[in-house]
Amino acid sequence: RDLRMSRGLGDVYKRQIAASPLLIKAHGNATYMLAMTIFATSMVLLYAASTIYHSICHVSAKVLRNFQKLDHMMIFVLIAGSYTPVCMIILGGRIGYTLLALVWGIAVAGIIIKGLWITCPKWFSSIIYIAMGWTCLPVFTQLWTDLPHAAFGWLLAGGIIYTIGGVIYALKLPVFNALHKYFGSHEIFHLFVMGGSVCHFIFMYHYVI
């Protein structure tokens, strides 16, 4: 586990470096800089929390549970962080900032729920994550109009990949867990999360800034 921790934190460090081009490209525009800082920070926090929780050992059950809470809470932060540049830069105005307030409000509520009820069923957590992720459905037409089709494709692909991962996480189907002793639905879920992050990073870097 110590080796996994070292490798995992190294991966987080690489992600932090990978996020820096967003900030470099956004430099000079205060709105872009703020939005991209929030997005990049949310991504780093999610992967840092996940790495620590899945790597720590020789700690009490209470400490482990607290890190589990942090891991789950950061999912809400990443979702809201991913919405931030879309709301502030692409949508803007009353619609953009209303949606921004809504998703961050859901994030705060989700963090409170996880803090008080970490043992809630996986399907319940997944429903909240997925519903929050698709809060943008009412503005889909505007996004399709305002964005190049390739940009909309990357944005949509990220959402779909995240959603598939969430469904796999919730269902925990035996077919996934029977394939390998140390690689099951939970690990597949993490792969889909990384895939969604890559899609949204490409979207942010090439089309939002």
Predicted regions and their residues:
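Short, small-residue-biased leader/transition segments that mark boundaries at the very start
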Residues: 2-13
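Hydrophobic residues within membrane-embedded alpha-helical segments of Major Facilitator Superfamily
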Residues: 14, 38, 45-46, 52-53, ...
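Small-residue-rich segments of transmembrane alpha-helices in multi-pass membrane proteins
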Residues: 14-16, 69-83, 126-140, 187-199
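Helix-coil boundary and interhelical linker segments in multi-pass alpha-helical membrane proteins
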Residues: 17-36, 82-99, 139-155, 199-209
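C-terminal ends of transmembrane helices
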Residues: 50-65, 108-124, 170-178
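Internal transmembrane alpha-helix with an interfacial aromatic "cap," most often the third helix
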Residues: 61, 73-95, 108-119
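Alpha-helical membrane segments in multi-pass integral membrane proteins
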Residues: 124-142, 149-171
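Interfacial loop-to-transmembrane junctions
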Residues: 172-195
